[in-house]
Amino acid sequence: MNTNPVFIVDDDTDDQDFVRECWKELGYTNPLLFFKSGEELINELMTHKTVPFLILCDVNIPRMGGFGLKAKLLEEESLKHKSVPFIFWSTQASNEQIKKAYDLSAHGFFIKGNTMKELKESLSEIMNYWQKSKQPQS
């Protein structure tokens, strides 16, 4: 089982706290690393050798936004082939946003939910899927 950290790009500190609580209740052992902007995530990926298990990204993040971040990651040759699932994870989504996410080669688009129960279900579905999915080793 992949024990690499899960990177979460979300500037909402309340959501970060809720995720930490749900993560603990679900019993996952992967470390969580939070980033408040796309620039913070890119800096981490470019300067450190840690390869995340997956990246969960809110659509509405400061400056470049989630879609801008995904587009930037596609431009970076050093990041393009790391086989890291990039999943949009937001409180709501229009059909246009979902289409845009997949146009940018996102690996999924999930709704966080409005309650702790829904948030836990969403995290559980994402983690269960990606723990079972086979990925090339980079």
Predicted regions and their residues:
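Conserved acidic segment of CheY-like receiver
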Residues: 4-14, 19-23, 55, 87
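Acidic, metal-coordinating helix/loop segments flanking the phosphotransfer/catalytic sites
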Residues: 20, 34-54, 120
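Acidic catalytic/metal-coordinating carboxylates
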Residues: 37, 65-71
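Active-site residues of response regulator receiver
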Residues: 53, 57-62, 90
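Alpha4 helix (beta4-alpha4-beta5 surface) of REC/receiver domains from two-component response regulators
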Residues: 68, 93-108, 114
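A short, hydrophobic beta-strand element within the central beta-sheet of small alpha/beta folds
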Residues: 80-93
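C-terminal output helix
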Residues: 114-124
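CheY-like receiver
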Residues: 123-124, 128-138
